[in-house]
Amino acid sequence: MPAVSVRHLAKSYGDKQAVRDVSFEVEKGDVFALLGPNGAGKTTTIEILEGFRDRSGGEVETLGVDPAERSTQRWLRTRMGVVLQELAVEPYYSVRQVLTRNAGYYPSPRPVPEVIELIGLKEKADDRVKTLSGGQQRRLDVGLGIVGNPELLFLDEPTTGLDPSGRRDTWDLIRQLTSLGTTVMLTTHYMDEVEALANRVAVLNNAEIVAAGTPTSIGGRDSSEVTIRFLLPDGATVSDLPVTVHSLEQGLVEIRTRDELRLLHELTGWALEHDYALTGLSVVRLTLEDVYLHLTRDADEPIERSAK
């Protein structure tokens, strides 16, 4: 049984449809990234899964129960964790006090010292929340989400405000949680975060899912053309090259192919045979950001690569 199952989900506010015919599943132990621009329907969808908002149509199961069913909502909320973009935490409590209080709301919480260690606030455990930096407060937010030892964790922009080191630490924490069986639903605008963490991705735009798959396959990434670029060697002409050239501007050769290994083999073999240097050789693939922007902004136009 999947941790989350959504079938033909719909939500309307009067004449406005916030979510339209959305379907997906999240397998236990996976990290599932739900992406989309502001206003696409992400927050509404997540709040329905959490049981904080009613749906207009469709079927939803979270940890095997209907989150809209009042009789199971208390049970569900003791088995899920939620990390919002902004949390209101008592500024005059210490980190340890806040976590200890919240741990008391759950039947089988994770030990508070373990949580403090996981979120990297051991040196700040007895400091008041108001003295924490923005990044440290964000770590505390994550701690509050995991102190209940949840089976399912909802993370909304978990690394916003963190420096690069803090982001990597948070990623490591998420990986550790999933290795222990925790399922994670992630919303983020950082595509590198998606590629680092997610097993599956779905992109919402204008209330509908416009694409779903793995980070490496969504939008045809795994079958798209690769662009190979290098400077034409001194003494060589385009006609000397063993492959078809798509463009040549100011000495920069550009070749597009779906068979990059064969082409690179031919190209490097030719260069070695003639003692040429392939200066500036680069292989440019379609990025997840390229695909995301195409799906959410200019889906009627050909996908353009961000790399130059």
Q: Which residues does each PLM region occupy?
A:
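Short secondary-structure transition/capping segments
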Residues: 30, 42-43, 57, 234-237, ...
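ABC transporter nucleotide-binding domains
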Residues: 2-6, 11-205, 211
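Short, charged/small-residue-rich alpha-helical element at the C-terminal edge
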Residues: 224-298, 308
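An acidic, carboxylate-rich microenvironment
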Residues: 57, 72-75, 97, 217, ...
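ABC-family P-loop ATPase nucleotide-binding domain
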Residues: 1-10, 298-308
